[in-house]
Amino acid sequence: MGSIEKLSSQLYIIDDYDFQRAQRTGTYVLLGDDITLIETCASPSVPHILNGLKELNIALDAIRNIIVTHVHLDHAGGAGFLMTNCPNATLFVHSRGARHMIDPTKLIQGAKAVYGESFDKLYNPILPIPAERVCIVGEGDTLEIAANRTLTFYDTPGHAKHHISIYDSLTNGIFTGDTVGIYYRELTKYGVELYLPSTSPTQFQPDAMLESKERIKSLNVDCIYFGHYGASTNVSEVYRQLEFWLPVFLETGKEIFKTEEDLVTANNKLANSLFEIVQSHLTQQGIPTTHSLYEYMLKLEMDVNAKGIIHYLTQLKVGPV
């Protein structure tokens, strides 16, 4: 099972084996005068990144830039650990996320509260990054990594307030993190394309997500590079599915939230409903109900999505009176 995939002559993706599963989360390697990595996943994935860089014959001291789209732990939890191995690298991050990379105390506390005894296996260690090695980027900022390759940063909230997307001039592609959803690429071998919104708590904002999608759409890119997982050139289908699934998720959540006062019960009901809706959609397209994707990823992700939607609706106070 290969851990590296060549996407273009100057772009690779390393499989981070997030949750010990292939094609879950990836780290992108952009070649140029200043070698650049986008996304770090969590610290248990850093050895996979280091092995991938070694396989690509990239010296760790040659890496100049490490970019995270946002500071959720499956995208940036390993940044501190990775940077201890890359002495010449600078971390690029949204202004709202920078302080958590410099002092990850709140990230650690939050993760331990959610994951308990599983924290060490999933995320440990989360290491601080010296402030002088952190560079804040925002809307319209650019980073030239080669004479023919400039990265442009865009503020793309919706999944998180501190989310950036990165346009790559060389490939006319954009690294979107979780802004326009998750790509279940392993289903393509069945002839199925599935892109689902990621509505995780606590900063999910559907209107902002759709506005960010429109911002990305306006760039007329040829390719979208997902945090989860890999590249899609069928960009119009990405946008279409986000526009389809996001209202489905929200309306399902609203119906449950209006009648269920207990938030834990509402979360569970919504997670089950979302799972059943997506599973039904996939079985109609020939994906067997025994496929490992259902048990290992979809159930987990629909639970996280449900929590984000219920939290959003709670903030709106659209619940029972």
Where are these regions (language model features)?
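Residue-level marker for buried hydrophobic side chains located in beta-strands
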Residues: 36, 67, 91, 173-175, ...
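Metallo-beta-lactamase
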Residues: 42-44, 62-74, 101-157, 161-233
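Active-site/pore-lining binding-face segments in mid-to-C-terminal subdomains
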Residues: 207, 212-273
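C-terminal regulatory/interaction regions
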Residues: 251, 255-321
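Metal-dependent catalytic neighborhoods of phosphoester/phosphodiester hydrolases
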Residues: 77-86, 104
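Conserved beta-strand hairpin/beta-sheet module of binuclear metal-dependent hydrolase folds
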Residues: 2-56, 166-178, 182
